[in-house]
């Protein structure tokens, strides 16, 4: 589903098995970072779009699931960053940072109405950075 590059690593998701992978381009090794079936904290389902923070944490948007963007670290820690409530018929799409990494943007594809005309885009920023 989603793919993002960061410092010689390609991160991508596979929805059919709810996994997040990383391909290390320098060693040509493929590694599973997250698997819903084996995770100690299986909160991430419907893995979809991916974006990387400046520190290398992986943000994964859910297609369905709990309508969350979840943070996954290289150490395997997984935690919800945010959740959109009341949009059960939608999915989170297109997470992206502004060039300064001060703001995160994402959309609810069908919004609270569950219709293609109901989509909405959000901007998230930290109050101490604005």
Model-derived features with residue positions:
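Sequence/structural signature of beta-propeller domains
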Residues: 1-130
